[in-house]
Amino acid sequence: SIRGQAMNKLYSLSIFIFLVSCQSQSNIYQKAVAVLQPGNESNVKGTVFFEQDKSNVIVTVTVSGLNSNSYHGFHIHEFGDIRSKDGKSAGGHYNPDGHPHALPPEKKRHAGSFGNLISDINGNVDTTFTDDTFSISGEFNPVIGRAVVIHAKRDDGGQPTGNAGSRIGFGVIGIAN
């Protein structure tokens, strides 16, 4: 009957809406981590922790193996593929909004374009900052499954990607508890 078909369609639509709402709620992660591995014969290692705080993400970076008192471009890249030793399998900068390359505090920049890490006399970095150009997961420029990359040189803000050189450390951004 027509009434039965209408009820079946309504029932199917209700189930679909329920499943979609459950899926979107379960994929909102609050914490993530990337464990860095060396690239291009560097000695870089460390961790990058991400914690969602309303519209900002708190980023905590602990890195060793950099040159003493040096600047290193630091970005989120498109893919979580870090199979290649040169890090190029991670793709280019993550740029879902199509902005030109820029450094913080510029608002219109690549998502997760963090500027530079600055190492101490021992080649270490231990820093925390916030960023509002992405989210860990959800609809606003999600970064779960992408890669974080440390470059060999300073990001000078130039086009198209800051002239930061080779990729000397990288890790996949994964879900943390």
Where are the regions that the model predicts?
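Basic side chains
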Residues: N8-K9, R146
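N-terminal leader/targeting pre-sequences
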Residues: C22-N177
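Alpha-helix initiation and N-capping motif
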Residues: K9-L10, N122
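Short, Lys/Arg-enriched N-terminal segments with co-localized hydrophobic residues
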Residues: S1-A6
